[in-house]
Regions:
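Residue-level recognition of single "structural anchor" positions
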Residues: 1-201
């Protein structure tokens, strides 16, 4: 959230720089590397900007899974369509009380896999890895903490904080599954970086 959504609503402010923000994340399931991210809003325009970044960050043919947000299929078809095997995974959540919803995510009661184009391997239609990374980012970046006053006040600062968090995750964070940093696994660097390395880059 940038500034305060409640203030924006109360004062009738029409300013795209105030209100909710959304962070798109593209993750490689094998190396756990965050390939691309985009801080904006959950709209078709920002979805297209994110998928364009993902297009620039990847090469060759690969399998892609997203949630059911309706802006993804057109953006992916335009930027990545000829080289992706694309499916969606839509999760259905149970009904929780308002109090439960404030402090924890609702319970998943069903999940539906849908092939959009290409020939994705059904066993690899999964959003669990990126959901785990989303949790990591939320835990590492105070600005994502819910129900606090730690939200960002300025877009520029928020984008910078997210970029630094992503860079630290890719280059400095040892991943338990692969036993190295994602950037090392992907062959981008030959050793884990320290925070000093990151700040000096």
């Amino acid at each position: 959230m940038l500034s305060k959504q409640k203030t924006k609503n109360r004062k009738g402010i029409e300013d795209a720089e105030i209100g909710d923000s959304y962070t798109f994340v593209g993750l490689d399931a094998d190396s756990k590397l965050i390939l691309a991210h985009h801080v904006g809003q959950r709209t078709a325009l920002h979805t297209d900007a994110f998928v364009e970044k993902l297009d620039r960050a990847t090469g060759g043919r690969f399998q892609l899974t997203t949630d059911g947000f309706n802006a993804y299929p057109d953006a992916i078809a335009y930027h990545l369509g000829t080289r992706t095997d694309y499916a969606t995974l839509v999760k259905e959540f149970g009904t929780e009380s308002e109090e439960e919803r404030r402090y924890s995510p609702p319970r998943i009661i069903a999940a539906t896999k849908t092939v959009i184009h290409g020939e994705p391997d059904e066993a690899r239609i999964c959003t669990s890895y990126v959901e785990r990374v989303n949790l990591d980012v939320r835990m590492k970046c105070r600005r994502f903490t819910r129900l606090t006053n730690a939200f960002s006040k300025v877009w520029r600062n928020h984008r910078a904080a997210v970029a630094l968090t992503v860079a630290h995750y890719n280059l400095c964070t040892m991943h338990r599954t692969i036993r190295m940093t994602p950037a090392t696994k992907a062959g981008l660097v030959n050793r884990p970086w320290s925070v000093g390395d990151l700040l000096a880059a």
